[in-house]
Amino acid sequence: TGVSEKLQHSSNIEKGLKLLKDDGIRAVWNAVFPKNILPLQLGYSSSGEVLQTGKGVSDFHAGDRVVSNGNHAEYVVVNQNLCTRIPDNTDIKEASFTVLGSIALHGLRLSETSLGSKVVVIGLGIIGQLVCRLAEAQGSEVIGIDPDTKRTDMSANFYTSVEEANMTNVDSVIITAATSSNEPIEVATKIARNKAKIVVVGDIPLNISRNDFYYKELELVVSKSYGPGRYDKQYEILGKDYPIEYVRSVSYTHLTLPTNKA
């Protein structure tokens, strides 16, 4: 979250840079964050060391290196369901991206793809890149789409357009773009096979055509952050877990898996 999300479109970035050059960082801050929304906590993916634990916490101890959905601050308080230990062979700075990995992982799980599936990822920001890596790791055939050549240059399987990729009959399209344009969802319906699944992870409008979904019997799912338990006060604040026989992968497991290196 934060300034990067507020300035996600190129026109806003140009305005922000000009304001920064002319009037300084405080002017940019005041323009992006009006006074009526302060105080504001920035960020949701952090790593650090446990200083102290509360009553009833038995899984963590002072000195443990952990990742969490805590804000970007020197000190944060986080429920144990939203923390996981950092493996000894993982750098603490690298681990700070874990929550982003869990968002990518949850989106991929919702796509219900597997070995040999054809997956297209639209939007190659950091979460889109992580979805691609995870999908490749499970043995899927992955194509990434993004208009930014700096992003597509990172892999031979990344393209600036669907026409360039020449991809059809896709099993699942995962949209990780952040845009006000309706193009991502329109593109997804065109390249998806009959009965395919479209998963929306990014912030996009959903002005869908009924006919596009009707004739192909497409399934649309909007991914919720890093999975079951998110925004549930019983889970996030009171620390009550879900029964494993009903919910196999919760927010905690999605946090835990990306911390382990292959």
Where are these regions (language model features)?
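Glycine-rich cofactor phosphate-binding loops and adjacent beta1-alpha1 units
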Residues: 156-221
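Rossmann-fold dehydrogenase core element
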Residues: 211-249
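Conserved small/polar residues in nucleotide/adenosyl-binding loops
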Residues: 253-259
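Mid-domain Rossmann-like dinucleotide-binding core that forms the NAD(H)/NADP(H) cofactor-binding site
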Residues: 91-163
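N-terminal glycine-rich beta->alpha transition that marks the start or flank
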Residues: 1-46
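A structural motif shared across PLP-dependent enzymes of the aminotransferase-like
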Residues: 69-80
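A glycine-/small-residue-rich N-terminal strand-loop-strand element
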Residues: 27-38, 45-69
